[in-house]
Regions:
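Acidic, polar-rich low-complexity tracts and alpha-helical solenoid repeat scaffolds
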Residues: 2, 15-208
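Sec-dependent N-terminal signal peptides
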Residues: 5-13
Length: 208
């Protein structure tokens, strides 16, 4: 919760600053876009993410200055994330990355994508796909932005994912051992040793 509030405040501060700049540049031509953005910001601060997303999306279409349109798009995505509309948020973030590839908030967009994939992890015993997808997105971020402030958070999440994946492999290996299927059991244990050497399950895999 603290992390989420921190990110909200960070984004609000950034966008408020840009809105003031925007008003200074062309107040007559841009007043409509600024008004839409401000309505979105007010709704966002009140927790009305549905309405906020609508206004930020409208603001993006009305801003002629690319920097402000891009920031409106980011806020629309974050509003969708706030109401757990994960697929819509991801679609909007992917569109943002294609439309504004040079925007200074691209790093944050990739972080939010990784975060959304991570939060879609439910029961790894039934479905490994969300785990694998989240791991890939987090890995991409860590390789692309290793020194980012967000890297610490994602490294922690990656460690949790790696342990979950290793636990699944060990569970399957134990099943094969119990049924005396030695070759697939060894293959599963080898996978833990090769791919998850930093997890808490490495010692058990080595001693099996």
């Amino acid at each position: 919760m603290f992390r989420k509030i921190f990110l909200i405040l960070l984004l609000i501060f950034s966008l408020q600053s840009c809105s003031k700049k925007e008003a200074e540049y062309e107040p007559q031509e841009k007043i409509s876009a600024y008004k839409l953005y401000q309505e979105g910001l007010d709704a966002f601060q009140q927790g009305n993410y549905f309405y906020a997303e609508k206004k930020f999306s409208e603001a993006e279409l009305n801003f002629e200055i690319v920097e402000f349109a891009a920031k409106s798009s980011i806020m629309a995505s974050y509003s969708l994330y706030g109401i757990n509309f994960y697929e819509s948020a991801l679609d909007n973030l992917e569109r943002y990355l294609k439309t504004y590839p040079a925007d200074k908030n691209v790093l944050y967009a990739h972080y939010l994508i990784a975060l959304i994939y991570y939060e879609q992890i439910s029961d790894e015993k039934k479905d490994l796909e969300p785990l694998i997808n989240a791991d890939k997105k987090i890995d991409f971020f860590l390789k692309t932005y290793p020194n980012s402030d967000y890297a610490i958070d994602l490294k922690f999440k990656k460690d949790l994912i790696q342990n979950q994946l290793a636990a699944k492999e060990l569970y399957v290996a134990k099943f094969y051992i119990s049924t005396q299927k030695w070759v697939p059991a060894i293959n599963r244990l080898k996978k833990i040793i090769d791919n998850y050497e930093k997890t808490i399950f490495i010692e058990e895999a080595l001693h099996r």
